Structures are given as C-alpha cells and as structure tokens.
Amino acid sequence: MGREGTLTIATRGSGGPGEVSVAIRGGRETFIAYSDQPISQNANVLIIESNPSRAVRVVEWPQLDP
C-alpha cells in the first residue's frame, strides 16, 4: 500500500479489473488492479489496498512534475 504504479491495462470500475505495473526491489512487478471508477491505460495510480492473491485496489493519482 502507498506505492505508485502505472496501469498497463485500463480498469473498468465495477465492470472488471485491469493491471498495474509497480517498481519493486529494483525491478517491476504486475498486479491485478481493481478500482471504483474506470481508469485509463497508462494512468498513474496509487495502491490503497492489497490482497495476498496479487490483487490491489487503486485510485488515480496525479504525477507531479519534477
């Protein structure tokens, strides 16, 4: 929880999950991503809940410019 990621497959809200890619331990891992509202592919998201089955709940999260 609390990590940022990028959606590689859009979520459809209650219509179904998508997929999120997250930087972990010097590499990238993917997780099934659920959201309350649809979120488009390549959107920056924040993980707000995780489950042992490699599924996470995400919300859209604005990416800050450096």
Set out the residue ranges of the language-model regions.
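Terminal membrane-proximal soluble interaction domains of membrane-associated proteins
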Residues: 1-66
